[in-house]
Curated annotation (Swiss-Prot):
Disulfide bonds: none annotated. Expressed at a low level in flowers and siliques. This is Classical arabinogalactan protein 5. It is found in: Cell membrane. It comes from Arabidopsis thaliana.
Amino acid sequence: MASKSVVVFLFLALVASSVVAQAPGPAPTISPLPATPTPSQSPRATAPAPSPSANPPPSAPTTAPPVSQPPTESPPAPPTSTSPSGAPGTNVPSGEAGPAQSPLSGSPNAAAVSRVSLVGTFAGVAVIAALLL
């Protein structure tokens, strides 16, 4: 009786590993490009240094040249549409990659995936049959 429970456990482990192996991975994310290039700092005009003998009058205020700082805000993320089930929509603006999909039925990758899954299925059935006999 214990050998049958081991066989059932191995069968369930095989099914679980097959499900994990065929689960789709996370979709790649694309960071948006900035709308405007970052502004370069303009060269500052250097004021002539005063001579040590000439002191400015105490009533004259000293001002520092203005410093331009780059904007700190990042561009807003593009809106994404979602279907009622919560899956990403397929309305993708032109020029951007669409959501990751499983291989189409006509692609050569689909045939390779199908062959791998068939080989795995037959190997699992053979192992289970050998353990039961």
